[in-house]
Amino acid sequence: MNINLTLIGQSIAFAIFVWFCVKYVWPPITAAMEARQKKIADGLSAADRASLDLELAQEKATKELQKAKEEAAALIDQANKRAAQIVEASKEDARKEGEKLIEQARAEIQQERVQARDALRAEVATLAVAGAEKILETSVDAKAHSEMLEKLAAEL
């Protein structure tokens, strides 16, 4: 066996093997690698988009939370103001009612005072008439007259 012929035969076999690999084996492998590479690139871009979306969502949530806090603070402030107004209105109503009751009591006292004065006048007039009758019935004795006046004064 000649070594040169062996080398040429092996070279031809190797060339056929390379051609076979390039023609039939290499295209599916490169296609699979390209598909895998595309899939990885798509996954990375989706991860980047998701990361960006997450940041945007977090910013939006932070803004919404801040807005909700501000609205809650405004509502609490408004409720406190309304409560203060209600308390002030209640105080004013109570003060007016108290003044009204005081005025009614004063009017009642004045009315009772007038009635008592009228009753006292009537009683004094009755006593004066009774005293005058007793004085006129008895003799015009100075001693008896002074005793009657003392009794009349005691009754008043």
UniProtKB/Swiss-Prot annotation:
The chain crosses the membrane at residues 12-32. CDD domains: ATP-synt_Fo_b. Its main location: membrane. InterPro entries: ATP_synth_B-like_membr_sf, ATP_synth_b/b'su_bac/chlpt, ATP_synth_F0_bsu_bac, ATP_synthase_B_chain. This is ATP synthase subunit b. The gene is atpF. Belongs to the ATPase B chain family. It is found in: Cell inner membrane. It is a single-pass membrane protein. One of its GO terms (molecular function) is proton-transporting ATPase activity, rotational mechanism.
